[in-house]
């Protein structure tokens, strides 16, 4: 659900506009206008009525508050909107009112309107993903040789580079872009099945009208009615769930690297950003929090859509209703995470000197694997691994650098010269 206090933080303005109350109404009204044009082409609606219907299909002409109250009684948003649309038309061209919503059902208007919104949402998400991918690519190249410690199980492991970490995020987002592109037109289907999805109301004109409607709205014509077959919507939401998860991983890593004990990278600073109400020294990862928050919420929302798939017969009771706010919320959360990820990627501040100090924090232990691999050539893997494990334990216990411990060990010295150890 939208919330004025938090929308600016968690969502992007352009996505909020797509799924605003006016945006939702306009999607359904676009369906009604296109339906009138399609039916006029099939000889079911006089061309003189089309202009009146089109003129009335402007969301700004309708009272959102009044419609909201009516929805609470009607059970869906299309019923009161179609009634209001008819009244507006009747006030100007009374004879055109009878042709409004001809042969359609509420779910046709709502589902098609939603698909139009989702298509716009996808355009926005794809554009933001492309921009973020370009930025991450530039930063990965810039930091291809910026060494830092790799961490496994939250412990220092072996050296990596910041460029490698950023390239990993880039790779995931590139795969998600491909997944979204593969959804393509088949995912964006209009709905024109009528009351029970059988197209019965329009008789022999039903298919020509359905084809013309799809063409008018630049949507695909489904093979069958999909009032209770929701797999396309769930597939789209699932890919957005993957996007949210990968952005959350990016945000999680950034936030961990911003910890005082690490201090290796930082979100870009700005006046008033990331401060504390009580601690003047704080620099909180407020952007990363949005990424992690979206990655936490979106999977639950996607699971709601999966749970809503076994819809009853030809129109569902409650399961369809569960989608109405869920899909927009997913899109809004992903858009907000993409916006914050772009800010982080563009302005990320890197403390390369701190990275180097952290590499040295364990006094050479991060290079133990490299020594073990070299020794394995002559000692065998298991023996070399055990030997290095003992040397590492001794280095920690004696608080000495691993290089010094290795140099003192007779088994190591027998295999590697001082120059090779260096």
UniProtKB/Swiss-Prot annotation:
Leading EC class: isomerase
GO annotation, biological process: 3,4-dihydroxybenzoate catabolic process; beta-ketoadipate pathway
EC number, UniProt record: 5.5.1.2
A Pfam family this chain is assigned to: Lyase_1
Reactions listed under catalytic activity: 2-(carboxymethyl)-5-oxo-2,5-dihydro-2-furoate = 3-carboxy-cis,cis-muconate + H(+)
SMART domains: ADSL_C
Subcellular location: Cytoplasm
Keywords assigned by UniProt, alphabetized: Aromatic hydrocarbons catabolism, Cytoplasm, Isomerase
GO MF annotations, alphabetized: 3-carboxy-cis,cis-muconate cycloisomerase activity; lyase activity
Major subcellular location class: cytoplasm
Any one GO cellular component localisation term in the record: cytoplasm
Pathway recorded for this protein: Aromatic compound metabolism; beta-ketoadipate pathway; 5-oxo-4,5-dihydro-2-furylacetate from 3-carboxy-cis,cis-muconate: step 1/2
Cited function: Catalyzes an anti cycloisomerization.
Summary of subunit composition and partner proteins: Homotetramer.
Family to which the UniProt record says this protein belongs: Belongs to the class-II fumarase/aspartase family.
Name of this protein: 3-carboxy-cis,cis-muconate cycloisomerase
Organism: Pseudomonas putida (Arthrobacter siderocapsulatus)
Gene that specifies this protein: pcaB
């Amino acid at each position: 659900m939208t919330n004025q206090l938090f929308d600016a933080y968690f969502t992007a303005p352009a996505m909020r506009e797509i799924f605003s109350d006016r945006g939702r109404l306009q999607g359904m009204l676009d369906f009604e206008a296109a339906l009138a044009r399609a039916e006029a082409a099939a000889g079911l609606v006089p061309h003189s009525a089309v202009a009146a219907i089109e003129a009335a299909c402007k969301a700004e002409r309708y009272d959102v508050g009044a419609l909201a109250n009516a929805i609470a009684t009607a059970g869906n948003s299309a019923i009161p909107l179609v009634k209001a649309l008819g009244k507006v038309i009747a006030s100007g061209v009374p004879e055109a009112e009878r042709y409004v919503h001809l042969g359609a059902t509420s779910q046709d208007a709502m589902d098609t309107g939603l698909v139009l919104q989702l298509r716009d949402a996808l355009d926005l998400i794809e554009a933001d993903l492309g921009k973020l991918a370009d930025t991450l690519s530039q930063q990965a190249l810039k930091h291809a040789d910026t060494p830092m410690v790799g961490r496994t199980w939250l412990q220092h492991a072996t050296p990596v580079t910041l460029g490698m970490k950023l390239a990993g995020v880039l790779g995931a987002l590139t795969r998600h872009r491909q997944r979204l592109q593969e959804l393509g037109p088949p995912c964006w289907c209009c709905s024109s099945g009528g009351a029970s999805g059988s197209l019965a109301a329009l008789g022999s004109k039903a298919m020509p009208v359905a084809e013309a409607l799809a063409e008018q709205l630049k949507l695909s014509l489904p093979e069958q009615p999909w009032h209770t077959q929701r797999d396309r919507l769930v597939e789209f939401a699932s890919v957005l769930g993957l996007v949210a998860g990968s952005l959350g991983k990016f945000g999680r890593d950034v936030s961990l690297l911003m910890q005082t004990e690490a201090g290796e990278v930082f979100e870009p600073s700005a006046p008033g950003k990331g401060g504390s109400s009580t601690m003047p020294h704080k620099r909180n990862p407020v952007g990363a929090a949005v990424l992690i928050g979206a990655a936490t919420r979106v999977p639950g929302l996607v699971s709601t859509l999966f749970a809503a798939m076994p819809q009853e017969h030809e129109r569902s009771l409650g399961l369809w209703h569960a989608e109405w706010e869920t899909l927009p919320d997913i899109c809004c959360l992903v858009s907000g995470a993409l916006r914050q990820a772009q800010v982080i990627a563009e302005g990320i501040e890197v403390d390369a000197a701190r990275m180097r100090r952290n590499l040295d924090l364990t006094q050479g232990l991060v290079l133990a694997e490299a020594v073990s691999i070299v020794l394995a050539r002559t000692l065998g893997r298991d023996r070399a691994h055990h030997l290095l494990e003992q040397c590492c334990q001794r280095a920690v216990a004696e608080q000495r650098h691993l290089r010094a411990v290795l140099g003192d060990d007779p088994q190591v010295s027998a295999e590697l010269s001082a120059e090779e150890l260096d």
